Amino acid sequence: MKFVIGPDVAMWLAEQRAQVPAQHKLLAPTLLRSQVLAWCYREVQAGRLARKEADARLNYLRALKIRLLGDRVLQHSAWSLAEQLGWPDTFVAEYLALTTLQAHAFVTRDEQLAQEIGLLVRVVPPEDLLR
């Protein structure tokens, strides 16, 4: 199956050094790279994560097979979805758009987001990636 993962799930996978079964294909918008880098930086600056651990998590994510996409069709779709949903920006909409265009489900740990988009796309918990 093809799953779109957001930064919350990427960091969850990295924290656990999880082994995603080969039959699962992971996808994300290209902005995922910047989001996980910013997340690690914030955690280190706040003293909640050691720099060495942040580097280990980033290295894990760099090695994880995630197909990163960011073409104009995705951007156009994200714009339309953000507008339709009344969102203030297109960041989350890129994940939603990618799910509608290329994946079977969106994976998130955010229950509020899952409820909000659950009528538009299939949403699954991160544990589904490990099965």
Where are these regions (language model features)?
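Short, flexible helix/strand-to-coil boundary loops that buttress conserved ligand/catalytic motifs
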Residues: 14-15, 40, 117-118
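Active-site neighborhoods of divalent-metal-dependent phosphate/nucleic-acid chemistry enzymes
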Residues: 67-112
